[in-house]
């Protein structure tokens, strides 16, 4: 994003299907209102740690609020009335983020708190191991788009509705809010890149398929390794991607170039 764009609202086609190295707040301010169909962001988790690729926010409430309140307000402004937002976050500050979302989007537009569960990592001495991320799901209005995603159900389970009818003759059931069937990013996978906290494509694919249609516009303002943009391109969605780290944008562009 060059200096000429700052302070001027951009028509969406000029920024769609591109990723840019920019402060996400400044980029969002240049996007016209009510233009985005879906926002997914794997936001900063507030650990206070310094990673190889970025420095996380400290878990201090004032710092968290000063960073996220203006950004979430902009996300609300640029989201369509039929749109929805998913913010992925760790358990350390998820309660603060939910309060901000309640204030900006309205608690009545809270749809779900999804738990993405995974294995691996260490075991703390004086606490339960933390083995899930929180994904907060909100809509802008009650007129949002949503399509159930299906998964194979256990042979031990009933796979039935409350009235006893089977969900699907092919042995599938709608995905619920407890996601245990998607593994973390495999470091040996061909999709793996040299970037911290890379999320698996299957995770983002589920969200994009559930809350957008082909040719819709999806935005990720904490792009990281670029997985959201890659999945959008593969699923025929338009996208906007942004990250303040030049390395992230370099990796994302390389991955996008590799998508046929």
Language-model region placement:
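Core catalytic lobe of class I
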Residues: 1-259
């Amino acid at each position: 994003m060059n200096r000429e764009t700052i302070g001027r609202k951009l028509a969406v086609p000029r920024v769609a299907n591109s990723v840019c190295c920019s402060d996400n707040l400044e980029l969002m301010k240049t996007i016209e209102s009510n233009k985005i169909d879906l926002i997914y962001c794997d936001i900063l988790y507030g650990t206070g740690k310094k990673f190889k690729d970025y420095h996380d926010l400290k878990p201090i409430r004032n710092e968290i609020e000063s960073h996220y309140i203006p950004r979430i307000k902009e996300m609300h402004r640029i989201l369509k009335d039929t749109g929805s937002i998913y913010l992925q976050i760790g358990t350390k500050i998820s309660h603060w983020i939910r309060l901000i979302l309640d204030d900006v989007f309205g608690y009545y537009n809270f749809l779900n708190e999804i738990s993405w569960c995974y294995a691996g990592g260490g075991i703390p001495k004086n606490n339960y191991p933390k083995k899930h991320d929180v994904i907060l799901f909100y809509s802008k209005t009650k007129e949002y788009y949503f399509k159930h995603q299906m998964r194979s159900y256990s042979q031990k389970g009933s796979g039935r509705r409350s009235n006893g009818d089977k969900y699907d003759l092919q042995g599938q059931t709608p995905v619920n809010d407890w996601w245990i069937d998607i593994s973390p990013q495999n470091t040996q996978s061909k999709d793996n890149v040299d970037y911290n906290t890379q999320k698996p494509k299957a995770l983002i694919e589920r969200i994009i398929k559930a809350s957008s249609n082909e040719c819709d516009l999806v935005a990720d303002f904490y792009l990281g390794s670029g997985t959201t943009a890659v999945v959008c391109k593969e699923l025929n969605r338009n996208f906007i991607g942004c990250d303040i780290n030049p390395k992230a944008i370099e990796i994302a562009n390389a991955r996008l170039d590799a998508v046929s």
